[in-house]
Amino acid sequence: MNVTEFHQNIEQVWAKIEEQLEAQDCDVDCDTQGSVFSITFQDRSQVVINKQEPLLELWLASRVGGFHFRYQNNNWTSNDGKDFWACLEEACAAHGEIVHFS
C-alpha cells in the first residue's frame, strides 16, 4: 500500500465509523482534526483513532487500551492478530455504547 492508498483507506474507515454510529443512533460526537478522528461519548470520555502515515498504521486508544493496526489481507489487524472493527466495538462498549461495525 502506498501513502495515497493509505489515506484513501483511512478515509473509508472513518466514514464507515460515522455512518454506523449515526445509523445505530449512538449518543456520541465525532470529530476529525488532521490525522486524528475522535469519538466523544456522553460522559465526555473518548476513543481516539489516528493515522500514522510514516508507519502506514492505524492507532486506536480508549479505556480498553492502545492498539496499532496494519493493513493486511484486506483488513486492519494488530500485531497480535486482533481485528480493528472488533477492537473498536469493544472500545465503544467500554465507553457505554453498544455498536456493531461488521
Curated annotation (Swiss-Prot):
Gene3D superfamilies: Frataxin/CyaY. Keywords: Iron, Metal-binding. GO terms for molecular function: ferric iron binding; ferrous iron binding. GO terms for biological process: iron-sulfur cluster assembly. GO terms for cellular component: cytosol. PANTHER family: FRATAXIN, FRATAXIN, MITOCHONDRIAL. Belongs to the frataxin family. Involved in iron-sulfur (Fe-S) cluster assembly. May act as a regulator of Fe-S biogenesis. This is Iron-sulfur cluster assembly protein CyaY. The gene is cyaY.
